[in-house]
UniProtKB/Swiss-Prot annotation:
The modification 3-methylthioaspartic acid is found at residue 89. Keywords: Methylation, Ribonucleoprotein, Ribosomal protein, RNA-binding, rRNA-binding, tRNA-binding. Part of the 30S ribosomal subunit. Contacts proteins S8 and S17. May interact with IF1 in the 30S initiation complex. InterPro entries: NA-bd_OB-fold, Ribosomal_uS12, Ribosomal_uS12_bac. It comes from Campylobacter jejuni subsp. jejuni serotype O:6 (strain 81116 / NCTC 11828). With S4 and S5 plays an important role in translational accuracy. GO terms for biological process: translation. The keyword Secreted does not apply. GO terms for molecular function: rRNA binding; structural constituent of ribosome; tRNA binding. It comes from the Bacteria. This is Small ribosomal subunit protein uS12.
Length: 128
């Protein structure tokens, strides 16, 4: 334990917390352009074809981001909005693409958790 005199001479260092999404540069979301849209397979116990896109952000970073929901309309040169949030079974995927923003369409025929997938409220007559 340091003495008072040692603390006067050199104060204690603040512990800096590392950002989990450095490419966003402290912004809630960033705009970017898709450079490649493809599928990849998850880590060991899981099996699927997960849809991901390589995106060049306005901050200058090129990141891999996950496309959530069933079906998408993204292709190369699509303008997308990227938020933070990793995908646990895809190594290196630390970002999500926001559905229903910019060039990304919302999920069609989605009735529950619509706000997460950019789906509009269905008409009253088309229920069930």
């Amino acid at each position: 334990m340091p003495t008072i005199n040692q603390l006067v001479r050199k104060e204690r260092k603040k512990v800096l917390e590392k950002s989990k999404s450095p490419a966003l540069k402290n912004c809630p979301q960033r705009r970017g352009v898709c450079t490649r849209v493809y599928t990849t397979t998850p880590k060991k116990p899981n099996s699927a074809l997960r849809k991901v896109a390589k995106v060049r952000l306005t901050s200058g970073f090129e990141v891999i981001s996950y496309i959530g929901g069933e079906g998408h309309n993204l292709q190369e040169h699509s303008i997308v909005l990227v938020r933070g949030g990793r995908v646990k079974d895809l190594p290196g995927v630390k970002y999500h693409i926001v559905r229903g923003a910019l060039d990304t369409a919302g999920v069609a025929k989605r009735t529950v958790s619509r706000s997460k997938y950019g789906a509009k409220r269905p008409k009253a007559g088309t229920a069930k």
